[in-house]
Amino acid sequence: MKTKEFHFNLPYSLIAQYPSEKRGSSRLMVLDPKLQKIYHENSVNNILKYINSDTFIVFNNSKVRKSRMYAESEMGSNVEFLILDRIGTDLFTALISKSKKQIVGNVYKFPEGLMGKILSKNSSEIVLKFNDDVREDYFEKHGFVPIPPYIKRDYDKIDEDRYQTIYSKYVGSAASATAGLHFSRDLFSAFEKNNIEYDFITLHVGLGTFLPVRSKKVEEHNMHFETFLIKDCVANRLENAKFLGKKVLSIGTTTLRALESSYDNKLKKFKTGQQSTNLFIYPGKNYCFKFVDMLFTNFHTPQSTLLMLVSAFAGKDFVFSSYEEGINKGYKFFSYGDAMLVLNHI
């Protein structure tokens, strides 16, 4: 399948540059792939019209690290880093600006005199070794929220709150699991009032989620691994919900990939503990969804693995028709944009 089949044209005015006025106030497009119907809601809070006590919701509670860092090269120029994965107390994978000019052995001066050296480098990332242990509070103090490059404005303090979900707990993501940004405390209270169960897994968002597909053919894309955690107690609740016939609603593509990666459909059991996945789901792969029944997600960038996953879940033609309708109706796209609820998969 050709990657360009997942391209679409989007007016720049529909790329959300700021979050909605308050969580839950974004618009919601609802897709029913089986009936080929599209519904429109003026608020994400109206998700309650489509779920009930027979639904079990799963969220990704990874927390976004302030992973955008700035340092000075030995030549005195400013260099930008995006810290990806922690692989040791002083060792991280990262992206680096002007990558072609940066070579193994280069040393950079970070805030407070911390020094970082490129240990190794490949086509997509570097391994960065610091001269001292780096705790998370260092990034909290000196780093910046890694808002995506299509948000073309100056850094704003509002991002420190709104680019993070209200339930984020475990630091490790280099980008937000943006589907969760829509959920407010009031909405969680409504879930509880309506006896709608929910729980959390943890997948740290990295290159596997946000690296675009650059190969001409979808099948040739190299999907990067991302680490995730499913606790025993969470797995037990999920398995029991499925046994009772409840519909599992995944909040976001990251949650879906974690659940689908670790569920054994024959044993009807999850593998628990810390794991990693490079699961790449796209139309034409004939992937059979094992555990997730419903998907809540955002409107994604062209030619992204996220758009491909949603297309496999709901049907490519139907998804692209819904995107076209969304554009015509002025829906906002990408991280701070409006939301989509897919009621079932094909």
Swiss-Prot record:
GO terms for biological process: queuosine biosynthetic process; tRNA wobble guanine modification. Gene3D superfamilies: QueA-like. Transmembrane segments: none annotated. It catalyses: 7-aminomethyl-7-carbaguanosine(34) in tRNA + S-adenosyl-L-methionine = epoxyqueuosine(34) in tRNA + adenine + L-methionine + 2 H(+). It is found in: Cytoplasm. Transfers and isomerizes the ribose moiety from AdoMet to the 7-aminomethyl group of 7-deazaguanine (preQ1-tRNA) to give epoxyqueuosine (oQ-tRNA). This is S-adenosylmethionine:tRNA ribosyltransferase-isomerase. It comes from Borreliella afzelii (strain PKo).
